[in-house]
Amino acid sequence: MSLFPVIVIFGLSFPPIFFELLLSLAIFWLVRRALIPTGIYDFVWHPALFNTALYCCLFYLLSRLFV
């Protein structure tokens, strides 16, 4: 259960997890842009799977901050 209430914008109600998902997506884009020039994707077997796992880990860490 999150500490934040349901947010209503223009008659649409958004659960708190929606904003955590958006924030983790923004952090994911920043981390990904930082990792691409380092060449780490040359060592990754499946880049799409790596990106999905990275996003899931970031979302988990971010959601643990708001509990």
UniProtKB/Swiss-Prot annotation:
This is Protein AaeX. It comes from Cronobacter sakazakii (strain ATCC BAA-894) (Enterobacter sakazakii). Signal peptide: none annotated. It is a multi-pass membrane protein. One of its GO terms (cellular component) is plasma membrane. It is found in: Cell membrane. Pfam families: DUF1656. InterPro entries: DUF1656 (IPR012451). The lineage of its organism: Bacteria, Pseudomonadati, Pseudomonadota, Gammaproteobacteria, Enterobacterales. Its main location: membrane. Belongs to the AaeX family. It comes from the Bacteria.
